[in-house]
Amino acid sequence: MKLAFLYAGQGSQHAGMGQDLYEAFPAFRAAFDEAAAAVDFDLKEVCFTDAAGVLNETQYTQPCMTAFAAGLTAVLREAGVTPDYAAGLSLGEYSALACAGVFDVQTAVALTAFRGKAMAAAAAGRTCGMTAVLGLDEAPLQACCNTAADEGVVQICNYNCPGQLVIGGDKAAVDKAAELALAAGARRCLPLNVSGPFHTSLMHSAGDALREKCKAVRFAPMQFPVLFNCLGHEMEETDTIAALLEKQVQSGVRWEVTVRRLAELGVDAAIEIGPGRALTGFVKKTVGSAISCYPVETAAQLQQLLRTMKGA
């Protein structure tokens, strides 16, 4: 068996995520608390109760999701479950890099907290959005975006799986492109629960900020390969992690290509780490049964997974 860890991105977060894991697994609790110490707000309160209603704001979402991922990774590692490859959707790429030993948990959380603030700042003062477009291929959707560009910036920003693309940018342009997409044959258009036009050119200033921030980060060698969003595969010898993270925030996420590459590499099992089952769905729609995917969000799911892995 070749195993990949797949780390979820923004959009699946919800109040209460991780609370049962925190109570059930000491390793989760230790890693989560270590992560929480890297930010200047009560990360546990935001994750578990979100009384202030800020969890969906990207500067909070990102470190909270990263802390959740760190906790789950720690439990899996303690149980002897380690991956041959890792990848993460957008934000999840930082957790994949932490899992591969490129930087520690606190650095991952500090970076994603910084990234969240930089992305929020890049979107400040603009009315923006992102919408999933179902049932329309890339070429006709790109034509819709080109036509809608007179309303503002709109670009394809996520290539999730066959039949599911995401567009983002100025809300008026996104809405116009979605309307055109439906007329062109798209099955549905669904606005996403995110707070900015992520992975579009509107994030250019966030990319600049990340480039400067990464100058102070020591990137250790990977313990196993990570597949990068903006490439859809492992990094080349001429690539640097800092440059890829800078590019990632302002360019499309090549997730479908990433999943196909994992299958080419012989991966036949994957664990989705994070709330929700979005990545599991993308894997199934992309490579069918070639990769068995196990989503893990709750203590019960994790306990079942550990039993499954023990018997594998």
Q: What is each of the regions a protein language model found here?
A:
Residues 77, 182, 263-266:
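Non-catalytic positions within long, well-ordered alpha-helices that form the structural scaffold/packing
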Residues 1-141, 146, 192, 269-287, ...:
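FabD-like malonyl-/acyl-CoA
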Residues 174, 213, 218, 266, ...:
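NAD(P)-dependent dehydrogenase/reductase Rossmann-like domain
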Residues 227, 246, 259-263, 280, ...:
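Generic hydrophobic alpha-helical scaffold/packing signal
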Residues 10-12, 37-39, 100-251:
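Alpha/beta catalytic cores of group-transfer enzymes, especially the acyltransferase/condensing modules
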Residues 250-267:
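A short, acidic, amphipathic alpha-helical segment used as a generic capping/interface helix at domain edges
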